[in-house]
Amino acid sequence: MEGQRVEVDGGIMEGGGQILRVSTALSCLLGLPLRVQKIRAGRSTPGLRPQHLSGLEMVRDLCGGHLEGAEIGSTEITFTPEKIRGGVHTADTKTAGSVCLLMQVSMPCVLFAASPSELRLKGGTNAEMAPQIDYTMMVFKPIAEKFGFTFNCDIKTRGYYPKGGGEVIVRVSPVKRLDPINLTDRGSVTKIYGRAFVAGVLPLKVAKDMAAAAVRCIRKEIRDLYVSIQPVQEARDQAFGNGSGIIIVAETSTGCLFAGSSLGKRGVNADKVGIEAAEMLLANLRHGGTVDEYLQDQLIIFMALANGISRIKTGSVTLHTQTAIHFAEQLAKAKFTVKKSEEEEDATKDTYVIECEGIGMANPHL
């Protein structure tokens, strides 16, 4: 598909891997030849890292495209996409690079493949600077499926920083079109639940301490709901290396989902990890939006592709979300508006409505 190359400045706005994920996925979907320059230009280690490289190679393989300049440390790539193919595709970061970020770049593409896809993704399942796989399963999946597609995700092995070694298998069936979504009614919080985990040599007491500290923190603000956080010792044969962490999810009467999460680090008290996750959840419940700060940017590409007008209500719009909107407008020509929420209960809050007129992308194979 040789045509006019679309030029993307990889150094603007969020200036990191997200620009690559959004622009290469849209390039693949829309058949747009792409050049991305100044990749991660402002980062302490500029250029492609292993997880970005494996994401790029995966998109190339999904469509049998042509990729140049793709090596560790490279600050410029060119990508020429071809037709999206279903079937089995493997990506391995060979590090603790996040499998969830690999999913972010590949999922929109395979929805428009000719046949079902199986994505074998290897790396970190519960990694820093990325959604944990539990977030992807507990929050992203049920909300993203409102766009009218389904996927399942089988966690074979969990992998942690610094070794990685995790593997998930994602199965996705293609769709003709994506439905628009309207998530503007928050409802009231009806359930709070979660899991605190330890893996490898770490004792279960660490998970129990994280869970107990999180519950105490939430109770100070939300007194009338039972908070159920399960402490879990990951099975030895299903986890590689040592790790710990927690995710807590709040569900509302209208089916909205919010989360707070945190990972354990050497030398950091378990209580502190639990409290950090609890405080993140509480902050995400205060703004009155229908999605948390980590879901908002993940929905933008689907809103851009959907057949109709989508609306989501958010707290303050993150830089990641602003970046995703910028590139969805530049590449897909979707039209977004971001307005302060005009509802009375939001008057004193930092609450916004993101609206998008999607392009109604149709799967040419179905």
Swiss-Prot record:
Root EC class: ligase
Residue pairs linked by disulfide bridges in the UniProt entry: none
Active site as annotated: H320 (tele-amp-histidine intermediate)
Biological processes, Gene Ontology terms: negative regulation of optical nerve axon regeneration; RNA processing
Protein name: RNA 3'-terminal phosphate cyclase
CDD domains for this protein: RNA_Cyclase_Class_II (cd00874)
Tissue: Detected in retinal ganglion cells (RGCs) (at protein level).
Gene designation per UniProt: RtcA
GO cellular component, one term: nucleoplasm
Gene3D superfamilies (UniProt xref): RNA 3'-terminal phosphate cyclase domain (3.65.10.20), RNA 3'-terminal phosphate cyclase, insert domain (3.30.360.20)
The reaction(s) this protein catalyses: a 3'-end 3'-phospho-ribonucleotide-RNA + ATP = a 3'-end 2',3'-cyclophospho-ribonucleotide-RNA + AMP + diphosphate
